Structure formats: structure tokens, C-alpha cells
Amino acid sequence: MGTALLQRGGCFLLCLSLLLLGCWAELGSGLEFPGAEGQWTRFPKWNACCESEMSFQLKTRSARGLVLYFDDEGFCDFLELILTRGGRLQLSFSIFCAEPATLLTDTPVNDGAWHNVRIRRQFRNTTLFIDQVEAKWVEVKSKRRDMTVFSGLFVGGLPPELRAAALKLTLASVREREPFKGWIRDVRVNSSLALPVDSGEVKLDDEPPNSGGGSPCEAGEEGEGGVCLNGGVCSVVDDQAVCDCSRTGFRGKDCSQEDNNVEGLAHLMMGDQGKSKEDNNVEGLAHLMMGDQGKEEYIATFKGSEYFCYDLSQNPIQSSSDEITLSFKTLQRNGLMLHTGKSADYVNLALKNGAVSLVINLGSGAFEALVEPVNGKFNDNAWHDVKVTRNLRQTSGIGHAMVNKLHCSVTISVDGILTTTGYTQEDYTMLGSDDFFYVGGSPSTADLPGSPVSNNFMGCLKEVVYKNNDVRLELSRLAKQGDPKMKIHGVVAFKCENVATLDPITFETPESFISLPKWNAKKTGSISFDFRTTEPNGLILFSHGKPRHQKDAKHPQMIKVDFFAIEMLDGHLYLLLDMGSGTIKIKALQKKVNDGEWYHVDFQRDGRSGTISVNTLRTPYTAPGESQILDLDDELYLGGLPENKAGLVFPTEVWTALLNYGYVGCIRDLFIDGQSKDIRQMAEVQSTAGVKPSCSRETAKPCLSNPCKNNGMCRDGWNRYVCDCSGTGYLGRSCEREATVLSYDGSMFMKIQLPVVMHTEAEDVSLRFRSQRAYGILMATTSRDSADTLRLELDAGRVKLTVNLDCIRINCNSSKGPETLFAGYNLNDNEWHTVRVVRRGKSLKLTVDDQQAMTGQMAGDHTRLEFHNIETGIITERRYLSSVPSNFIGHLQSLTFNGMAYIDLCKNGDIDYCELNARFGFRNIIADPVTFKTKSSYVALATLQAYTSMHLFFQFKTTSLDGLILYNSGDGNDFIVVELVKGYLHYVFDLGNGANLIKGSSNKPLNDNQWHNVMISRDTSNLHTVKIDTKITTQITAGARNLDLKSDLYIGGVAKETYKSLPKLVHAKEGFQGCLASVDLNGRLPDLISDALFCNGQIERGCEGPSTTCQEDSCSNQGVCLQQWDGISCDCSMTSFSGPLCNDPGTTYIFSKGGGQITYKWPPNDRPSTRADRLAIGFSTVQKEAVLVRVDSSSGLGDYLELHIHQGKIGVKFNVGTDDIAIEESNAIINDGKYHVVRFTRSGGNATLQVDSWPVIERYPAGNNDNERLAIARQRIPYRLGRVVDEWLLDKGRQLTIFNSQATIIIGGKEQGQPFQGQLSGLYYNGLKVLNMAAENDANIAIVGNVRLVGEVPSSMTTESTATAMQSEMSTSIMETTTTLATSTARRGKPPTKEPVSQTTDDILVASAECPSDDEDIDPCEPSSGGLANPTRAGGREPYPGSAEVIRESSSTTGMVVGIVAAAALCILILLYAMYKYRNRDEGSYHVDESRNYISNSAQSNGAVVKEKQPSSAKSANKNKKNKDKEYYV
């Protein structure tokens, strides 16, 4: 068998052999591996990183051996294919040093037959195919998904020097593999034939010898070489030999019959191609070159830069009929095949988007024809025959006379089947050309007249012939034979070789790009490419020249550059070009081109003019000015721009570059000046991230899987999803990373000082903010050299956008001043809001949250914005500002300017041009706090400007119940007041129609030593809004709309003598004591000390608050701590102790043997009636039976309350108009001579009793759900009829509640016949400290019997100060109730607890100067809620274990006289009317949004330490509170 031995240095020998014998794989030639040590073959590197595949055919009898190997040259990644385990193929590979993944086929391949082997790489997966019968895949568990390949593709073995260099091999064990023995052929990578680079000890052979074994494909009769002749490939199907003759040029069962339709290299084989025994055993391709080959065919391969040029100048063409024939084979869609002529006399034949294009112009206009196949395209790598004929024909015209006219009939056919016929226009029938005949391309294809393409042909052309009546030009033959008139440009192979395809690439991310060499296109140039995407925006091509400074003296710092760009914006394709004398921007096509289809773009220029075409639609352009030179000095960027853009200059007209819009989609067939660019190879060489060497469109929409987290908005992109995170507070591709928050207190800022001055015509800005102020700067661009700005600010609760483009310093038509847009309303609600700004030239769009966008158009021709800085919080660059916006107080997040998230970039240190003092993280903001240390302190500021509208904001913190916060008077009766009244905020004003009062809404008094936020506003429609923390109250007033203020604005109070002259609705009698902060007066942030016209009293910066705060142990013996601004005080009322901290003994009397008594009598006109009572006393005794304290009503009423000892246990009995009610502590023995404290409370029929620290005993009356409504309705009934109604209610089984007309308090029990003997201390009853009064010889007290005062009376300073403080804050409303001493408690199993009481008043009903003087009429003047809760147990609750049984009151009563019955009936009618009015009252309405409360007062309260009751009590309290500030009259 004839062989060609390939030794070391085999690259030259192998290539020489292939040139002599033809393409080795076209006719089935293979490589024979003898299995010798040192054998190997190296093919070009297979870039198997991502998605790719290779295939080959294998034939062997060996059971072991290395078939294929490549790696990353000693690091981590490799792929190995070996024969093992009885001739089966085993594949192993690894990525990123992961555990290698291995698969083993089930089918042995060492049967001496040919097998097709295919390896497909897909990131972490690799699949191995054997013939059509087996496919297996395996996945490697790697953190990285792309494989790195550095080495060549080694087949059959490894070079000895590589085996010896251990560090060069990633898989060390591959050195020990046996070499492969057998044959391998048809090695292909991604369907393209791969040729060996070099080899050692490997033979080239076209047909492997028979190996014996009886295979159907092995030799037939003796003397024959096998079943399949002429290089046919044999395979076994159903135990029968089947020949594949597709690559031989023969056909038939055994590939013995000549095929007349020969393709590929087969056309070279003419004459007798049979095999002879006298051929010295030369096999493979060589035998095909023997014998009579008949007519020789002339073929040439063009790779994009080669072409033929035949000079016609000596023998010009002049013809009316002619014919052009040629055959072509290619994989490329576009390319020039033939051209002759110039100006308006030419013929052009080209491949355009896979179809054959013919353009003929004989001087009267172009005739164009396009021939397309029915299915697919002509660029299918198969041979196609083209024939163009032009004949002169005579036709008859119709008109005034019959005239014979000549026309040229043009016919073009492809493969003899697809034909198109047309006519050139009349009068011009002759084709004349004295120029050149171009074949396969030209020096500048884009500049050829009529050329529909700009790139040269890539592929094979065969038998290119032009002929007419006078001449026959066999252009292919003339080129090969070296005719002197034929010039060959480039290295042309006169055979058909495979031309590497210009594979498409995909830019998967906006950040991915490819750098191309500098484009030298000073005078002329062309670029063509195809693209495909569904994304609306992206920079496709960009390059610029050397920067040069603007010659305009008005703007010396403006840098100009020549540039060229093609970009997509909003789905439209734009060409941008500037040659130094002005920019041209052309929309290439009116329709959008982001529909996912392929579009062919062809750009051509010649000096100032040129065209850009999309598919077949061409748009001409002419650049302004005189310059015709395009001077590009930088690289040409494809798909985007590098991340480090320091050296780049972006013209303002290239919007996508400044907006950071990279292209995402596919690009293919890039030709520059007619030369192809293998962008796939460039991407591999540059190791560009995010560039994939293929193009496919996923059918599934990525957004269907909801990939955007945290409510991000999803948009489908090109094989990806795009999340809009601007309104979420998160960042990242999927909105998965929480964005950084910046906190501003009015003195803080963040300033981005850009490295170079920026000039833009398009901006994308988004941010989130949260503020309680109606004014404040959010973001602004500022310039050191001009008034240019793009500014976002809060203005009266709305977002205001201001865009000012300064026309003074440049040559432009003067604009009409800043453009402004407003959006949103009431945005100072302490909620997060999202702002988006989009500017495109003159067009503006402003959006807040999800509201409708506000749009506007800028006046003038100037659209360029200049800025050096991006500022937030405070504007520091103020040189060109006519008015400075108010500083910002609040929070900012997710500030993004043209794709740059500056807050997070600044925090992470990704940029070094960031200056800030704003604080990272969400913080409670207390700006510029000031302390008013006394109630006489105040400041005066300039008059409040609030004529048409008003927005006030401040924060305060105090322990005072009352105080004037703000006051400003004006013309006439106009004024405004903000004050605290009993811990609640009042807003009082008069616009000229009379004073109005709006009470702020809050769940509890605001004097809790915590910060509270107050916003007060009035809009132009007289809508008044008061917001306290999260509670909102609104009111609309009629009449006058303007607040005309004139005098100074007082903060914190006024002069002492001024309080007397304040308007009637103003309660304040003294100033505010506490802290104020963040004061905002209609957008003005005053410094309360520096800006004050004058100050009075003690005012200091900062807010330290009380130096001493209430703690759990501030007061002893269960005393209640009361927080004061200058300290604390203790309420010792219910402790029996006294002193500043309730740790001193209370006033004590000893009752000796024989008994004694202390009696207190109320004056006849001052006898209280109460719904609630509180009693506390300390004692020590050894008696088993005694009465300690008894309170009786006036004679004849029978109401009483008695504290007594029975059988050594303490108990209370009381009667408020029904049967006696008793409550007793049965578990505590108190007659042990030790000191005990007993506390008793009553509210209606409810009662509690506690001894020392024992659990509280609770007593609940029988009743129903009407109790609360009846209690409210009873207020409407005159007192004189109250007893009648109570009697009627008693009949109905309802509990009475009022302890009427209390007359005496008797201490000692002597009158009751059970005199007390022992010690009594610190008696407290409903605000009266009777033992103290006795010791001070009060006139209403009488002492009889053996009673002796122990020691001295406790200091009146402490006791009286506490009592005075208590009394001064008391309210005498009938609705106020006593707070229980402790939460409801299970009688057993719970340890004793100390539960201090809250600061509330006893429910004492007294006559008032503001009420009717009748002492029996106790109709309240101003009902209001008090305390925390009544101790009424929640409905449906089971009795506590061990507690006293709930006693139902008897419904029996004494008989009623007729008059009383009549009065009761009248009262029933009144009651029903009152209930009807109550249920249908108009309470007004306002909106309260508590869904989000971001500013939380996290500090623990240092006010009074009060433990509230469990839900049963809290619920009752809430029901009472909702009736506060309501007045009812009957």
C-alpha cells in the first residue's frame, strides 16, 4: 500500500502532500496510527469552552489507547478520550479543578469497522455520540461553567517533549496512556473540516487495509481493495455493507459509476478514473490524478481579501448582447462575485443576504433582479450555477405612429431552474466598459456603482466566463494561466478549499464588547454587518479621533473629536458622524428594528456624502461643513465600551455611550472596507466575557419565571430578563441586593466630583427619597463654569424638576430660561417615593412612583448639559444660582445617574471622587435640636411667610402638659398658634373669618419625653392638614384664603404679659419647656439661635433632656414615678408612705385600747359623687374583727364604703344603690402585728383589692354588653333624674355605678361597734390625705377617743408638692376613671408583683364655675378620656381559678310611686333620644396611614414608669378614649 510517512516537521510535509493529493478528507483519506511510541498528530486548538462540537470517524481493532486529548497547559481544565475496557470509549473532563466527570460507552468500537464519533460541549455538560445508536452525557460539578483551552487538539498520542514536561500537562496520567492504533479521518470542528498542523510517526492513507475478521465491509474477492470503491465510506447496516459515495464523485452501490453532477473537488476527475494494478499501489487521492482527465475546470478560492482584476483598457467591451456564466459555492450571505463598468454603464453580480443579485445599468437607469431559492439560501456550501444573458429585442410602440423600438431583454437563472427576466430601459442598449473586470471582489466594493454589498466574496468560484458576439473571456482560466492583463490580488488557491465561516456572536450583557483595530477611513470607507436583537437600546459601533480643543473663545474647554457611531435607541437605528465641521445624525429606517429578525446594515461614505442602508432601504446623507476627512485615532468598538473609559471622549450626540447602553444581541458578517472580520476569533483571543460564539433565540420568555425579586419590574430582553429595580430599594441583576440608604439632617451632603467635565444631551436619573419636609434639594448636577443644571427638589410637597441650559457662554439661540416640571403631591409623608427623569435632547419626562408621567419640551436649539458635579442634600456649587434650594432632611436611596448607582459606588469605594458627610444607613433624624430650659424662654424670628399656602414641620420632645410652641400675629385678627394643651397638640388660626381650632390626633398625650414629628400645612384651597407622627387630621375652611402675618414669629413662647391678650381659643398661659428640632418654616430652615432677632431665657443647642429619668426602682413601695423636664417626682398616694421617693413613713396614728375615731366631714355644698374611688392605708394590728375606714353618703341615701377586718382577713363592702357588694383577700392573714398596706379601687360596680404585694383580687359585676353605651348615655341625663333611672335600670338587672353625695369619712370604727386597735398610716382617699389633715388640725376633722399621733407630720414640702402636682393635672370629668393597680391576675400560681398606677385622677363629680350652679346637676362640661382602663373583664372570659364567684345583683326593688314611674318613662324617652343622637353623630373623618412607620422612637421612655393592663383593660380604655373631646347636651 502506498503511504506518505509524516515525520517531525510534518507541517510542511503534510501540507505538501495535501496540495499534491487534494483535500484529504474530501475523498475519505485518513490518518493511520501504527501504535508506535512517539506517534501523535496535532490539530488546531478546539475552543471547547462553551457550546461547540467536534466529530471524526474511527476504525480500530485495539482495545486500549489514547484517542484525543487537550487541556489548559497545566492548570485545571482538560478533556481526554481513550479506548479502554474491551474497546469501549471513555471520556473524562474537568473544569476549574473540579472532580473530573467520566462516562463510559456501552458499545465497543474495536470491531474493525468505521464508527462516527461526535463530542458536544455545552458548558458544564459534555455529550458523547457513537454512530446513531448511543449518546451519553455527563456534567462536572464546577463553580465555573466555561472550559479554558490553551493547547492544540492532540489525536492518537502526545509529542515526546510534551510527555516529558510534566508541568505542561493538566492530567498527569495521560503520559502513561498507550498510543492509539488504527485509522482516524474526517476530523471536523463545528461542521468545518480541521486539517492537521503537524505530526510524528503517522501515515496518510486513503483506505485502511483489511484486518480480517469477516466484516461485510472488508475485502471481497482476492485482489480487490474492499466493498466501496473510489474512496467510498462503508458502514454496516443490518449486517449488510452500505457505501456512502457522497464525497467521491461517483455513485452506485459500490461507488463505481461516474457522477456527471460532480461537486467539490470531483470535477477534477475526468476520463478513466478506475483503479489499475499497474499504479504501483498508489491509493488515496493520488489515483484520481491518473489517466485521461478530459477538460480541466478552473476553480479559485476567495477568502474575502482576494480578487481578480482583468484590464479592459486595451480592448474595451462594446456589446448589445452578452452572456455571463459562473458557478459558486459559499457559506457567506453577502459578497461581490463579478463587476465591470463604471459610472452609469456597468454590470454587477453579487450574493446578497443569501440571494443572487444582478444590477445592470446601460445609462438610462438600473435594472435590478434578485433571485431567491424557494427554501433556504444559496449560501449552503453547495455548488450553484448562474447564467446571465442580455439580448437585443425589437418591440412595437403604440402612439401617433407605429414605431419599432429596441430593448434589452435580461435573463438571470440559477441552477437552470430559478429564472428572472426583465428589460432595460429604451434608448440605451449597449454595454460599454473600458475599465476592469473584477471577479471575487474589488479594492473598494462599497464604492462600485450599483453595488448592493460592500464586502468581497468568500468561497469558491468556478468557470467565470464572459462572452459576447466578439469576445470570450474565460476569466478563471486567464487567472490561473497568468494572463498579463489579469492581475491577482492576494494569495489565491486554484482549487476549492473550505473557507472558515464568519460565525455569528452574541453579546449577552450590556458590558460585553470587542475591540477592533483602528479604522483608517479618512476619505472613503465602508462597513457592513448583520444584527439581530429584541432590545430597544444599544451602542453597536463607535470610534473617535484625537481630542482637540474648541476654537470658540467663549468655550475654550469644550473638546471636539471626529467620531463615527451606529446605535440603537428606542428600537430605531441611527448613524452618527462628525468629521470636524458638524455632526450628522440619521435615522436609518423609520420602522423599529428590534423585532428579533436579522437586519443587514451597509454603511458607505465618500468624503462628505454617503449612504446607510438597512436591508434594501437606502438612506443618503451629506455631512455639514467643508471637512471631508474622517480622522479616527482610537480602536473601533463593537457591541459596547470598556468599563475603564478614562481615555475615551464621548460626543454628546452619542446618547447610548453616555447612558451606558451596551448592545445585547447577535452580530454576524462584519466587513470593513470589504475585508471580512472574524469577530468570533477576536472574541476568543481577547477572552471577552459575555460574548458567546453562536446566535440562537430562546422561545421561552424569561420573565415568565418571575426572576425579579422584591417587586422589581421585569422586561424580556434578548435571551435574558431585565429588571427595573428603581422603585424597590434594591439593586443587582435580579433586585436581590439591598441598596444603601443615606441619611441627611439638613447639614449633610454627598458630592460626586467627576474626573472630567461632562457634556450630555440625554440623561436617565432615578432615586428614592423619604422625608417629612415639604422642601429640600434631592439631586442636582452643577458646573463650575456655567449655570447648567438638572435639579430635582421637593417644593411644597411636590417633586420639581428644573433643567437649565446656559446659552450665554456658547453660540446658541438664547433659551427662555429654565424648564420646570412638577409631579406628585403630599410627598412629605415620611414614606418612600421613587422619582424617575428621562431626557432625550429637548424632550423631558418626570415620573413619581406609579403616577402618570409629566412631559415637556425645552425651548431653543441648545440641548447640551454641562456639569462637573452631582450633588445631593446641599448644593455647594452656588456661583451661578439665583436662589439656593432648601437643604434636604430625610433619606435617599438608589440614586442612579446614567446607569451609575452612585450611593453604593461611593460606599463600596468603587469610585474615589466621592465626598460626603451624610451618614450611611437608615437613622432617625433630629436636625439642629435646641432646648428651651424654662417655660419663660423663647426666640423671635422674622415674620412667617405663609400668605397663600403654608408648610410647617418640626420635631419636639417634652414632659410638660402645656406650652406655647409657635405664635405669629398679623393684620386684623389674622394669627397662627401651635400649642400643647394637656399633652395634645392644638393648631389655632384665623384667616379673617374667625378663629378655628384643629386638634392633632394622637393615641396618647405627647408629653412622654419622646420625639414627635409634626407637619402642619395649608394649601391654596384652604385644606388644613395636621400630621402628628403617623396620624393625620384634615379640615377645610370656607371664606378668606390668605394668612396676612406682620409681626415677629415667636418660637417657644411669648413675653409674660402677652399671654393675657392671646386669642380666646388659645389655652397657653406659659411657654414650651423641652426640645425643638428640624424646624422648617415654609421651606426655610432657620437656626433658632443664630437667626433669632432676640432671645429670652435659657436656650441651648442640643437636647439632653432630663438629667434624671424614671427607672423601675425610682420610687419605693410601689410609688409611681412622674417624669419632669428638670427631674422626677414620686406619687406616693397609694403607698401609705411619703417623702421624695416614697420611702418615708406616712402620717401615723395609734388607736389605743377602748377605741378612738377620726372623722372628716365634707362641707354641705361640696359633697362629691363619684363613679370611681381609690383608697389606700397602712396598718398593723392583732385584732380579728375591726372597722378601719368607712365612707358614708348623706343621710337617707344609704351609699357607703367600708374597709374592715373579719376573722383576721381584710375586706371591703360597698353599696352604691343596690345590694351590698363585698370583696375580700381570703389568703392573707393580716392580724399578725406586722405592717401591711391595703389598696382598694372601685369603678362602678367593678372593684380591686390588694394587700401588700399579693396578687390583686378583682371583682366583676354581672351585666351585659350595653354597659358602656349606657354609661355614655347616662351622661346626658340630669342628675336630679339619675336616681330614678338607676332604679329603673335596677329592675332591668343593670348595675348602678355612682357613690352619691359622700358626706363623712370615719377612721377607727368606733361608731360601728368594732373599734380598731393598732396603728394606721398614710390614709389616702380620692385625693384626700385625711391623717395628714388631722395632724395639721384641719377644721373639717374631729378626733375623739384614744387616738395619738406618732412622731411629726411628714414634710409638707414633699407631700404637698406631690399633691399639688397631682391636683394641677387633674380633670373632673365624669368620664375619667381610675386605673387599676395591677393587671388581671390568676389567683393561684403567680408570684406577687409591684404594679405602679398611672398618673390619673379620681373620678370625683363636683360643681364647677363653668357648669350650672345646681349642686345636684352634675352634667359634665367637657367629657374626656382618662386613665388606662376600667377593670372590667373581657366578655366570655372564664373566671380565674380561686377567685371569688361573680355575684348577680337582685332585681327586686321597693314599690314605685306613680310619679316616679312617670318620671322614669320620661327618662326612657330622653335616653333613647340620646342614644340615637350618639349613634348618628358626625365625628368628621380623616385618613390615617399606619402601614409604614420608618422613623421609630427606639429609645426607651424615660417618663413615668407605668405598666398597662392586659388586653381586657386596654380595650375598655380605647373605647373610652374615642369619645374624648365630644360634648353632649340634653
UniProtKB/Swiss-Prot annotation:
UniProt-annotated binding residues for Ca(2+) 1: D345, L362, M430
Cystine bridges: C228-C243, C245-C255, C460-C496, C666-C695, C703-C714, C708-C723, C725-C735, C906-C914, C1075-C1103, C1110-C1121, C1115-C1130, C1132-C1142
Classification via Pfam families: EGF (PF00008), Laminin_G_2 (PF02210)
Transmembrane segments: 1455-1475
Span list, region Disordered: 199-221, 1411-1443, 1497-1530
Reported modifications of this chain: O-glycosylated; contains heparan sulfate. Heparan sulfate attachment is required for synapse development by mediating interactions with neuroligins and LRRTM2.
Alphabetized InterPro entries for the sequence: ConA-like_dom_sf, EGF-like_dom, EGF-type_Asp/Asn_hydroxyl_site, Laminin_G, Neurexin-like, Neurexin-related_CASP
Subcellular location: Presynaptic cell membrane
Glycosylated residues, chain numbering: N125, N190, S705, N813, N1246, S1408
Keyword Transmembrane: yes
Residue numbers on the Extracellular membrane side: 31-1454
Quaternary structure and partners: Interacts (via laminin G-like domain 2 and/or laminin G-like domain 6) with NLGN1 forming a heterotetramer, where one NLGN1 dimer interacts with one NRXN1 dimer. Also interacts (via laminin G-like domain 2 and/or laminin G-like domain 6) with NLGN2, NLGN3 and NLGN4L; interactions with NLGN1, NLGN2, NLGN3 and NLGN4L are calcium-dependent. Interacts (via cytoplasmic C-terminal region) with CASK (via the PDZ, SH3 and guanylate kinase-like domains). Interacts (via cytoplasmic C-terminus) with CASKIN1 and APBA1. Interacts (via laminin G-like domain 2) with NXPH1 and NXPH3.
Described function: Cell surface protein involved in cell-cell-interactions, exocytosis of secretory granules and regulation of signal transmission. Function is isoform-specific. Alpha-type isoforms have a long N-terminus with six laminin G-like domains and play an important role in synaptic signal transmission. Alpha-type isoforms play a role in the regulation of calcium channel activity and Ca(2+)-triggered neurotransmitter release at synapses and at neuromuscular junctions. They play an important role in Ca(2+)-triggered exocytosis of secretory granules in pituitary gland.
Name of the featured protein: Neurexin-1
Organism in which the protein naturally occurs: Bos taurus (Bovine)
Gene name linked to the record: NRXN1
